[in-house]
Amino acid sequence: MMIKTRFSRWLTFFTFAAAVALALPAKANTWPLPPAGSRLVGENKFHVVENDGGSLEAIAKKYNVGFLALLQANPGVDPYVPRAGSVLTIPLQTLLPDAPREGIVINIAELRLYYYPPGKNSVTVYPIGIGQLGGDTLTPTMVTTVSDKRANPTWTPTANIRARYKAQGIELPAVVPAGLDNPMGHHAIRLAAYGGVYLLHGTNADFGIGMRVSSGCIRLRDDDIKTLFSQVTPGTKVNIINTPIKVSAEPNGARLVEVHQPLSEKIDDDPQLLPITLNSAMQSFKDAAQTDAEVMQHVMDVRSGMPVDVRRHQVSPQTL
């Protein structure tokens, strides 16, 4: 009886500890920059789903990854409540985008923001939400700078946004004041391009990071935007790209390919089936003798969002 009681206490303790761990704010994923010639940073982790281990979104938040990134890395997982005992791959390893390692680089295709702090040999990777399909809500590519930043921002929704909300039975005021009901959260960083209509901002919701849910702006978890807000200054370069596939010929001989689902352009598009166009450099990478083109094509079809080695391995005659 005593053993059973003691076991029950330990079980209660570990259940509580797991719940607390999921509830704690996630730390930003900061990695040292790779050596010359490499683009690989980070390291994947594994998560064993506990009994009543929380939703997939809660697990994504714990490791500070995006919801869709976690879903793509674990095909077949229940998107709401993963099965207890299942092992999830946490996609923390990535190839740095093919863009200057300066300021903020956002790859909307992979729903990630990369921040390169000045004077430091590191990069911090944040999951983001971007503009949803339809009308003026798409997030555009651009090269711009931070023009302004503001704590406790108000929100002035556009006429189109107000009309969209009204169609859902929600009457938005002309200006939404700062506070718990403001979907911009507690911090906003304004971009100079397009007249300053696009911002990086927080959120008052627990869902939507790593998804296409915003009205065109870049959405981050509140703890992430708070950290980024404290680090960037007006004039910081911001480069927004749309690159669903990244490749790297690594110094150690690995030939890495990372493929994400391309962004849909129509509501009925299936991003898993949308074609991926290779530029000349990527086509040369695929056609190279060192690359197993069949394996690379398979990686392009699966679209796991994680780097995969597609180098061709030589078969010794003695093993034939």
Swiss-Prot record:
Name of the protein this chain belongs to: Probable L,D-transpeptidase YcfS
Biological role: Responsible, at least in part, for anchoring of the major outer membrane lipoprotein (Lpp, also known as the Braun lipoprotein) to the peptidoglycan via a meso-diaminopimelyl-L-Lys- bond on the terminal residue of Lpp.
Pfam family, one: YkuD
UniProt keyword annotations, A-Z: Cell shape, Cell wall biogenesis/degradation, Glycosyltransferase, Hydrolase, Peptidoglycan synthesis, Periplasm, Signal, Transferase
Signal peptide positions on this chain: 1-23
First-listed, main subcellular location of the protein, grouped into a coarse class: periplasm
Catalytic residue list: 201, 217
SUPFAM superfamilies named among the record's database cross-references: L,D-transpeptidase catalytic domain-like
Compartments, as annotated in UniProt: Periplasm
Knocked-out gene: effects: Simultaneous disruption of erfK, ybiS, ycfS and ynhG leads to loss of covalent anchoring of the major outer membrane lipoprotein (Lpp) to the peptidoglycan. Complementation with ycfS restores some of this anchoring.
Pathway: Cell wall biogenesis; peptidoglycan biosynthesis
GO biological process per UniProt: cell wall organization; peptidoglycan-protein cross-linking; regulation of cell shape
Domain LysM: 45-90
Residues annotated as domain L,D-TPase catalytic: 102-241
Subunit and partners: Interacts with DsbG.
Any Gene Ontology CC annotation: periplasmic space
GO molecular function, one term: glycosyltransferase activity
Recorded family membership: Belongs to the YkuD family.
EC number: 2.-.-.-
